[in-house]
């Protein structure tokens, strides 16, 4: 399974996830990994992304006026995006450096499908514009849970 298929599968799991309790301290839970044919990946938890989307009231963090379609559950379809990309190398780095898990509520941004795809497949300039905006909105939450990263470091993770 390639990275794009893996992300689509994860977005599907987010839509199906149940999250009836408010999660806290998700950044303090040690990351877990899956070892597969395509290598080692972080075992991301869909219910954590679901909570981030709910907390954002199903609004795109880049532009709240962006509209999308309704899911079969009657809520706007939104996707969860890890601002600090949730790769195994990043997860290992942040755990070893800060003892923090990047698969946490504070690192997951609610995005409309168009903005989410733009971050992954857009031009470098478009990616930079969105990432800088999201960083400004999210940096205090990241620092609150011990995920300290500069905008330059963050942008380098998207190259």
Where are these regions (language model features)?
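Long, compositionally biased, charged low-complexity segments
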Residues: 10-17, 138
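Intrinsic disorder/low-complexity signature
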Residues: 3-4, 17, 22, 79, ...
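Short, charged surface segments at domain edges that flank catalytic/cofactor-binding sites
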Residues: 14-75, 87-104, 149, 155-156
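Mixed-charge, low-complexity interaction segments
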Residues: 1-13
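A detector for short metal-coordination/catalytic motifs
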Residues: 77-78, 84-159
